[in-house]
């Protein structure tokens, strides 16, 4: 009996010593800014064993600080190397080696659960490691996975996704190569309202998406439209060749660096590319590319590109490109382009382009363009262009080097030609046209289709025969004037322009006319203030008469035979100085239409 007891005690002691080993020994290490080699020497001394390692592999000269009281050797080494070194006990030594990752392969076939037919372009992925692949035309897939726990293999969850099919999950044992197949069922068809089921795969349908993304990458985005992950950073050479591999299109990053181009789910930080960035979802806060940026969601922050920016939702912030900007749901902020800006949503802010701005919905702010601006809805602000401006409803100012066009103008139109259907503001130009007017038109020719159109034939104290065309409305109308005296020895000709305002039974007008007296060198200028009482004498016919005050300026008194020598004629003028004289006269005549 005594011998049996001694045997059991001896066996337990051996078992305890074996279980403890060198990694299980307890040590205390408190060292500040010491080389790793010194820390290992201290552990060796306390544990009564030896390390075996290559100095370069463990970075023996690196300076570290360690605080470990009554910890196992393994715990101290884990703290020291953070999983980068593997430990192996051999006799009385503890080998330190590089920690090589373990990989295993999973393969199989994916078939249609209803027909049994193989499914082509189905996505198979692991959501933690962000590793994915797609089935070939026989429905076969092969996936290389990393073993997460080297001491105890853990099961891995794979997901099979395909557009119009239900997602299917496969549990895979870790640690060894294996085959596993699955049949997935089509999604149940249901009737819904109008929804954008593939709202985050739209970038693949753009021209740029079709050119720079492969068909497999576009299929992947369709299959995984419900799966997205967040990661702190990524880098890539081209779409699919980077940190997140084939799943890069489903990852939202905080920092994204693309050597040539990248394809990501979105951004919540900074993205820089040597050529292009393509993001399926929203982008915040800064995006830079030498060529172009394409965003499937909203853009908030700063977006700069050398050629083109395209946002398939809205922009809030600053957007600039060397060639063009396009936004589907408008912008709020500043939009600058070397050639053109296009927005199909409501806009608020400044839009400036070297050639043209085209906005399809309401705009609040300013539009500046070298050639033209177009707002297909309401413009609440200013349109300034070198050639033309177009707006449906203008509540602000249109300023163009040639022509302004609007359906309704409640502000100001300034250009060579201004045209509007309903005028409730002011037009200033050489030619103004309005279908109907409750505003003011100031120009050489101002036509209101449903306003004044009158032909005047009348006599004045200066010229017996005068013609004038009056157009506009009661608030303000314009006059184009011509007059003549054909009497031998008293010839004279005049031409000019004027504006006037009509009241119930009378009108007030100011005109400016040039008076030709036989020589263009002696031509004078008349400024005339006149008022007239008018009376209707028939349908579309009125008689008018009234006084006039005329100021005449001429810096040359040379006389030409056959032309007037005395102004106004029947009586003399009152001279104010050598160049300026005035007189009081009249005008009387008829108006038609």
Q: What name fits each language-model region?
A:
Residues 261-263, 276-278, 292-294, 308-310, ...:
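Transmembrane beta-strands of outer-membrane beta-barrel pores
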